[in-house]
């Protein structure tokens, strides 16, 4: 996880990959964005990561970064797409906010035909790592990005 979240696995704020899509970008990318390979319904959105609607940065010490974000809308996530997911794939829950790529991140765990979303819940009643079926978790969410 340190290798994924931090450039050269150096745990420091200035080495942190602050946005999910940072993991698959640049000279130090550690995963590949496979989202578009999973569905013909993939949507591509131009975003200005770290930019608030008023133009200010969300995180003052992090630069605003233009990026094309790909995601599969939830309504197109079906059995065929779920069958392509593998244990260890990273799932980002797409954010419609202009300065963000995702709202939450987790890892795929396959249990036979079940696709489990392992994530750290921030809900007050949970505050722990949880396993939930991905399809159920996605109800009411915009869509997903998938990295491998």
Please report, for each region that a protein language model flagged, where it lies by residue.
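Acidic/His-rich structured neighborhood in mature extracellular/periplasmic domains
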Residues: 1-69, 86, 92, 110, ...
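Intrinsically disordered, low-complexity boundary segments flanking structured domains
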Residues: 5-7, 77-81, 131-135
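Short alpha-helix capping/helix-loop boundary micro-motifs
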Residues: 70-81, 95
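Generic hydrophobic, helix-prone segments enriched in Leu/Val/Ile
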Residues: 72, 85, 136-138
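Short linear motifs in intrinsically disordered
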Residues: 81-83, 107-108
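Short gly/pro-enriched beta-turn/loop segments at secondary-structure junctions
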Residues: 85-86, 101
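C-terminal soluble interaction/assembly domains
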Residues: 91-147
